[in-house]
Swiss-Prot record:
The keyword Transmembrane applies. It comes from Haemophilus influenzae (strain ATCC 51907 / DSM 11121 / KW20 / Rd). It is a multi-pass membrane protein. The lineage of its organism: Bacteria, Pseudomonadati, Pseudomonadota, Gammaproteobacteria, Pasteurellales. This is Uncharacterized protein HI_1036. It is found in: Cell membrane. Coiled coil: none annotated.
């Protein structure tokens, strides 16, 4: 079945919203400064939809479960809207959407952080937010793989791992993995 351009556009908007929701949950989990511009943006974009959900899914141990629940629901709605899938498949699709959104968020944060590190040598709050988000992921890799001069290969290693996992899930789940994100 071929999707129309409108469906692809709507899917892109849905995926972008899922990324902002993951970013919001990740910022809270990493305890990035609330007044950082990246945090402020994520909070302003997501608060209108997350505040009502917090009554159902409160924050647990610094994990914003309301954001994860909303991404789960979004994944299920995509399955209903696009393909009219059964309930069992929708539940799996919701979980896959959360997982794929987390992977995409990690990829984009690492990529943007790496690009910012090339151009920005000063004290910048946006760069610092990306540093706070990526450092817990990169620190174990840096212990195994030392930097060569001023070049840090740890973001590339994590991105290759994400690429491998994405291809593995695509081989394992096929179209369901594509629908998830």
């Amino acid at each position: 079945m071929e999707l129309s351009q409108t469906a692809l556009f709507i899917g892109s908007i849905i995926n972008l919203n899922a990324l902002v929701l993951i970013l919001r949950a990740w910022l809270q989990f990493a305890r990035v400064d609330y007044y950082n511009p990246v945090s402020t943006f994520a909070v302003k974009m997501t608060d209108p939809v997350l505040k009502p959900l917090r009554k159902i899914a409160p924050t647990v141990k610094n994990i914003d479960t309301s954001a994860l629940l909303l991404i789960f629901i979004i994944g299920m709605l995509k399955g209903i809207i696009y393909f009219g899938l059964s309930v069992n498949v929708l539940l799996v699709l919701g979980v896959l959407t959360v997982l794929k959104s987390i992977g995409l968020a990690i990829f984009y944060v690492l990529f943007i952080g790496a690009v910012l590190s090339w151009f920005n040598r000063g004290n910048n709050s946006i760069s610092y937010a990306f540093y706070q988000l990526s450092e817990p992921l990169l620190k174990p890799i840096r212990r195994l793989l030392p930097t060569l001069g001023m070049i840090d290969f740890s973001p590339m290693v994590v991105m290759f791992i994400l690429l491998f996992l994405n291809n593995f899930m695509l081989d394992l789940l096929g179209g369901l993995w594509i629908i998830a994100g």
